Amino acid sequence: MACLTLALDAMGGDFGPCVTVPASLQALASNPQLKLLLVGNPDTITPLLANADSLLLERLQVIPAEHVIASDAKPSQAIRASRGTSMRVALELVKNGEAAACVSAGNTGALMGLAKMMIKPLEGIARPALMTVIPNQRRSKTVVLDLGANVECDSTMLVQFAVMGSVMAEEVVGIVEPRVALLNIGEEENKGLDNIREAAAVLKNTPAINYIGYLEGNDLLTGKTDVMVCDGFVGNVTLKTMEGVIRMFLSLLKPSGEGSKQSWWLKLIGRWLQKRVAKRFGHLNPDQYNGACLLGLRGIVIKSHGAANQRAFAVAIEQAVQAVQRQVPERIAARLEAVLPKSD
């Protein structure tokens, strides 16, 4: 198999190289065909590679970038001042064909704007959407978009998201005739904002989409739908709320350190319950599905959580590898051409 090269914004995220560098080494160790371009400040990155395996370092290259886009910077200002930043240099590597995909945990708005400006949307797509695939209670997967790229969406954008999500569910996840739902405040047809109701009317009359109607937020993990569509504001809040609840739930399974006075048999039962529940629900751990694909571009861009740890960022790198191997942009473009009208 040919070498697969990815560009990583090593300086992005809450923890920067402290997370991205060890995660990169972890990804290289698990994928012998992978080559990584770490974009950022060499003075910060290089010391973190001092004890790395020399064989791994043969497939890793540090690309200098003097500046970093702050996580709290306004997207418009960040884009104007983006030259020489680690995020922009990483995207330029994709644009120039030196890397097959870009992974960044940096400023979401800046990443969205720069990616749209440099890599360009697919024909027929107004604005890209952040998409992830999450596990559900049926041990299957649910495609969810938008997760924050577009705070406000009109009905046309929601329809485009539905088409892209359906393509991802079918072509990448492997679901035949995936069910598509719009996230709403109720399942009744008269519920919701105008843009949601207008999108529903269009989707009902789109034969290529298996539209099943509205679903509420409490159905996100039930597996009632294969694709859940919403605007970026609702999607981001919903996903992060869900992840927070899951993290709290999983943390309750860990020993609290307060059970030293418990009898041995209570401790034994407690450990048994922890293992059983962890086995049943551990697949819902957000670290295992970190990495949202900026869907609708001519190239592949993966957005990691800003607060991602080493394990989670390594998962985002793997998401990029899979997106490249499965030729996500090409597959989406082929399906969009048959479903969506071409722009003038």
Swiss-Prot record:
What is the main EC category here?
Answer: transferase
Its Enzyme Commission number? 2.3.1.274
GO CC entries: cytoplasm
- Identify the metabolic or biological route this protein is part of: Lipid metabolism; phospholipid metabolism
The family database entries (InterPro entries) matched by this protein are listed as: FA_synthesis (IPR003664), Phospholipid_synth_PlsX-like (IPR012281)
Catalysed reactions, semicolon-separated? a fatty acyl-[ACP] + phosphate = an acyl phosphate + holo-[ACP]
Q: What is its main location?
A: cytoplasm
Check the record and name the SUPFAM superfamilies matching this protein: Isocitrate/Isopropylmalate dehydrogenase-like
- What are the record keywords, sorted? Cytoplasm, Lipid biosynthesis, Lipid metabolism, Phospholipid biosynthesis, Phospholipid metabolism, Transferase
- Report the record's Gene Ontology biological process terms: fatty acid biosynthetic process; phospholipid biosynthetic process
The compartments listed are: Cytoplasm
- Describe the family membership recorded for this protein in Swiss-Prot or TrEMBL: Belongs to the PlsX family.
How does this protein assemble?
A: Homodimer. Probably interacts with PlsY.
Q: What is this protein's function per UniProt?
A: Catalyzes the reversible formation of acyl-phosphate (acyl-PO(4)) from acyl-[acyl-carrier-protein] (acyl-ACP). This enzyme utilizes acyl-ACP as fatty acyl donor, but not acyl-CoA.
Xref: NCBIfam families: plsX
What protein am I looking at? Answer: Phosphate acyltransferase
Q: Which gene encodes it?
A: plsX
